[in-house]
Design a protein with these regions (language model features):
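Conserved GNAT acetyl-CoA-binding A-motif
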Residues: 96-111
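Short amphipathic alpha-helix that is part of the acyltransferase structural core
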Residues: 1-30
Length: 152
């Protein structure tokens, strides 16, 4: 497996579209999925490949001069639990080391959907801590959990 930072905006959008199409349990709302695809064109993106086969990606978005956020991350279902997400996370952290103090991610709070409960466990496994829940940031059915990790 190799992880590469992708520079071409159309390639970024194609990568995000392909991976998110494989993850409807997490990315099943067409408008928000399209927003991730469109926004990825302008964001730093790392992709994981096995030879030429796309496995997953992660995008990054600066939120302040001390914090950057995992904007979107996805690994195709067939490749879950094989260390790809952790490898993407590691590549991301290497690239932000010395530039930011904190890395954050937003996800749906625990206890609402099994898929997002698994997402929380993944982020905890790579060192993220639960910071705060915003019960209605997205809507009342999807309370937003903010998780953070010190990377400075």
């Amino acid at each position: 497996m190799r992880i590469t930072e992708v520079e071409n905006s159309e390639e970024k959008a194609a990568i995000v579209k392909e991976v998110l199409a494989d993850l409807p349990e997490w990315f099943g709302l067409p408008d928000s999925t399209q927003a991730y695809i469109d926004e990825s064109r302008e964001l730093p993106l790392w992709a994981a490949f096995d030879n030429e086969k796309l496995l997953g990606f992660v995008t990054l978005k600066e939120t302040s001069n001390s914090t950057t956020e995992i904007h979107c991350m996805g690994v195709k279902k067939a490749y879950h639990h094989q260390g790809i997400g952790k490898a993407l996370q590691s590549a991301l952290e290497e690239s932000v080391a010395g530039k930011y103090d904190f890395l954050q991610v937003k996800t749906v709070d625990e206890g609402h959907y099994d898929e997002y409960d698994a997402t929380i466990r993944f982020y905890e496994s790579v060192g993220f801590k639960r910071l705060e829940v915003f019960p209605t940031l997205w809507d009342e059915w999807n309370p937003c959990l903010v998780m953070v990790k010190y990377v400075g």
